[in-house]
């Protein structure tokens, strides 16, 4: 289906694609077409499953050989992980049968605003672009280019329209091109050499005197930083590429020797390093002195790294828990300043997780400093290195804590923000692709539970495949109690949110019963599993029969008896067991099974010992913010349901 702004021609389906078998374009819906780029057409599409918008650049190739060469050359783009480079999701080759042409397709991030549009808007308004903002963007672009050049990758198509703005102060490079495709001179001459900028560049190269005129005009007009540009442009416009200024020289001229400023502190990597012996000597003091060193040497990543390592080894009493606001602030600032350095991100996340964990253990009543800065910093780290498993586990664990530690209104806001950022889809993608990584699965399920806890779901569609994903996870880790516990929590919340389809009820009930049998000693697992069972049984007689039917390992009713005997002194567990019995007893066909299984004696004992606590309005069965779908109907308390069961003959 084509969007209203489309040009009316739908691409035919792909034939080959390393990232997706069969027909890759089948999983995308074309919404509209952007202005053509230098070498191809840019389509804004939506993934059919996740509803996430992407950009697909389609480049027409002369033949199969050229397409295959270009695909091979561009495959390294899939591994690029940098805060200021757009993530490439997929590359594939497709055949357009309508015009008998072969296309290379590059699937990239979608962002509405580019630097080109900022320039055009300022021209229309006859306004000057803020110099400090421009310098900050330039620093990020240079940082990204240095990273690419370090990997021997050349952008080949750098221009304002290929600098996208993720936010007001964060840009990314996109639309890297291939040397193979750039050799198509006919297409390149038509689309690229006809621009005013290209004519100007050729003119300046051919006539050095004209460049002097331009620079003199800039000086006369008092253009900001004209002197810096005067030092840069002659070297950048050399005809022979080997004579041109390198990216490191550009950084040195603009940010180290010049007056430019940028928040992209990886540029400070060009400074001389501080010897480890001196760093260790500076870090011998207490927390206050270490923080002072970190602040005084904020631009030296090696100092920041060793300082955080030192803090990680400190005992809780020296760290000053529950919270030292200045410590958290310095760590977050370090993450933001050194977003290019993976070791810094890993160490900072480990330290934040350590601080959160220690504070919750030693001071459970203390509220964490889970402010926007922490969430933003760790989320930025995740997007910069989305496939780095060790970082992914740390970030998932941190976000799970920060989301649940906020007040209810703040937590809902954070949960919505994270969902809008695509975190839900990210979790599901990695539960599927990283099934062999236990830590990814456990932390992913924990964060999924935290996002679902408030019941504010931006888009329920992706959640429909969660039961099947969890089934795969539990099949992979059949004896893992922690995995089962995390899974039961997610199943319970999904049942309350109505995100489990009727055809999935039997499967989910079986998995919940299996988890209880596996880990009767885990109270949290038991509570969440029985809550999930009660929620499903309330709305489905099929689920109720699945609980009571005799299967391998015994029936659910015998399991209920075992649970009660093990946890009879825990009111919360007994309440959740009682709620399940109430919903089972609401089906006439199930009542005979309850009686024949000698459940009346158990029910009588629960009634006598816990009647006062078995009131649904005060039950842990319902969580604030969650819809009432899994809760008893008004007036239907557990104690009332148990009365009916006892009276049944």
From Swiss-Prot:
Keywords: ATP-binding, Nucleotide-binding. Residues 1-23, 621-640 are annotated as: Disordered. One of its GO terms (molecular function) is ATP binding. Residues 28-379 form the Protein kinase domain. ATP binds at residues 34-42, 57. SMART domains: S_TKc. Residues 1-13 have a biased composition (Basic and acidic residues). InterPro entries: ARM-type_fold, Kinase-like_dom_sf, Prot_kinase_dom. Pfam families: Pkinase. The protein kinase domain is predicted to be catalytically inactive. Belongs to the protein kinase superfamily. Ser/Thr protein kinase family. STKL subfamily. This is Serine/threonine kinase-like domain-containing protein STKLD1.
